[in-house]
C-alpha cells in the first residue's frame, strides 16, 4: 500500500459511498416465476442499486428453461431448486455448464430423492488424480470442491458420510500434490 492509503485506513478517512448494491432477500418460493420475480425486484431506495446477476440466478434461469424446471412445483420444489442453484461455481465454468450440473442434481433429487450414486462416483473419480502440473491440479481442486459441497448438503446423497470422507481425502491429496509442485517450481527457480 502507498503511504496515502495507509493514512486513510488508519484514520478511517474514505470517500463516502454514494450507491450500495442490493438484492432482495425476501424470496417468494410459491413458484419458479415468483422466485424469479422476487430476485428481479428493484430496490426502493435511491442509494441502492441491484447487484449484477449472480451465478445462482444464472443457474435458476438455465434450469427454468429446461425440463427440470417443470419439476419444481410449489414451495418445496422451488425452495429445493433454489438450494441447488446455490451450488458455488468453484470451477469458473460457463453458466450453461454449471447449469447442467445444477439441472442433473436437482432432477435426481426430485425424481430419486438423492443424487445418483453412479453419477457422483464418476464425477469424483475424475478428480481423483494427483498427477499433472500446477494448473491441472488447481482445476481438479476446484472440481472436487463442488462435490465436497454437494456431499455436505443434508439429504442430497444416500451415503453422505462416505462421500464427505472421500471428497475430503481427494482434496487433501490434491492440495498436497499442488504444494509439492509449487515448492518444486520455487526451488527450481532459485537454483537456476
Identify the residue ranges that each predicted region occupies.
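C-terminal or mid-to-C-terminal helical accessory/interaction module adjacent to the motor/catalytic core
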Residues: 1-82
Amino acid at each position: 500500500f502507498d503511504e496515502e492509503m495507509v493514512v486513510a485506513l488508519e484514520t478511517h478517512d474514505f470517500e463516502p459511498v454514494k450507491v450500495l448494491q442490493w438484492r432482495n432477500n425476501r424470496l417468494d418460493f410459491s413458484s419458479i416465476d415468483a422466485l424469479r420475480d422476487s430476485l428481479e425486484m428493484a430496490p426502493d431506495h435511491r442509494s441502492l442499486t441491484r447487484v449484477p446477476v449472480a451465478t445462482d440466478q444464472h443457474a435458476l434461469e438455465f434450469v427454468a428453461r429446461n425440463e427440470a424446471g417443470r419439476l419444481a412445483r410449489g414451495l418445496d420444489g422451488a425452495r429445493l431448486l433454489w438450494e441447488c442453484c446455490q451450488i458455488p461455481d468453484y470451477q469458473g465454468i460457463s453458466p450453461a455448464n454449471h447449469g447442467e450440473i445444477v439441472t442433473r442434481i436437482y432432477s435426481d433429487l426430485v425424481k430419486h430423492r438423492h443424487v445418483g450414486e453412479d453419477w457422483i462416483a464418476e464425477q469424483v473419480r475424475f478428480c481423483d488424480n494427483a498427477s499433472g502440473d500446477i494448473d491441472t491440479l488447481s482445476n481438479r481442486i476446484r472440481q472436487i470442491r463442488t462435490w465436497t459441497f454437494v456431499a455436505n448438503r443434508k439429504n442430497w446423497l444416500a451415503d453422505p458420510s462416505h462421500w464427505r470422507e472421500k471428497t475430503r481425502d481427494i482434496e487433501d491429496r490434491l492440495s498436497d500434490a499442488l504444494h509439492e509442485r509449487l515448492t518444486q517450481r520455487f526451488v527450481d527457480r532459485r537454483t537456476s
